[in-house]
């Protein structure tokens, strides 16, 4: 089973998991406010023992300058961030540290965690011109477009926030990887973003 995760602040209730089942059926699972988001993800994986791949909207590495390799002196952005327009892992600070720690825990559980960036996939799928991240009123229209492009089957009424929609985009990035249609940005030595 593959999942997509929109990763939020630890206790904010903004973390959402999109889970792909048989026949392209998708379910959405949202972390509650004041619930530990990291534990929510780990508990979810334990409850579904067949999860093998998870795509997450969070940095999973630091700029290569911190490894003192190749004489690179960009301490703020990785190549992948510059190419995709993603935020600096350093700006995201604690979220980045939590995501890297989560990656280690998930690897121990047999789950491969891959960094994705839903905004870049929205650009690739031409969803930005359709109101992506503009106003919540665009979510139903974008859900319909995503269903057409992905063949996902899900209840649009469950997509209540942009966090839910980004979880779906993260899941579609994982699906694109399965279909060998993914795009990879950045330097593998430093960390890549896959959509």
Residue map of PLM features:
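Phosphate- and other anionic-substrate recognition elements at nucleic-acid/protein interfaces
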Residues: 1-195
């Amino acid at each position: 089973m593959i999942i997509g995760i929109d990763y939020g602040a630890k206790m904010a209730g903004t973390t959402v998991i999109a889970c792909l089942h048989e026949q392209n059926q998708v379910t959405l699972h949202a972390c509650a406010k004041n619930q530990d988001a990291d534990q929510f993800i780990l508990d979810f994986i334990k409850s579904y023992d067949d999860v093998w791949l998870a795509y997450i909207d969070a940095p999973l590495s630091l700029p290569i300058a911190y490894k003192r390799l190749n004489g690179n002196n960009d301490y703020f952005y990785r190549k992948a961030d510059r190419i995709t327009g993603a935020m600096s892992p350093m700006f995201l600070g604690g979220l980045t540290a939590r995501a890297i720690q989560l990656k280690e825990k998930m690897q121990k559980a047999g789950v491969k965690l891959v960094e994705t960036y839903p905004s870049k996939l929205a650009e690739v799928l031409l969803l930005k011109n359709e109101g992506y991240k503009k106003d919540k009123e665009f979510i139903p229209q974008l859900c319909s477009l995503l269903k057409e492009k992905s063949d996902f089957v899900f209840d649009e009424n469950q997509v209540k926030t942009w966090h839910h929609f980004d979880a779906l985009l993260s899941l579609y990035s994982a699906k694109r990887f399965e279909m060998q249609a993914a795009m990879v940005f950045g330097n593998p030595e430093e960390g890549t973003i896959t959509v």
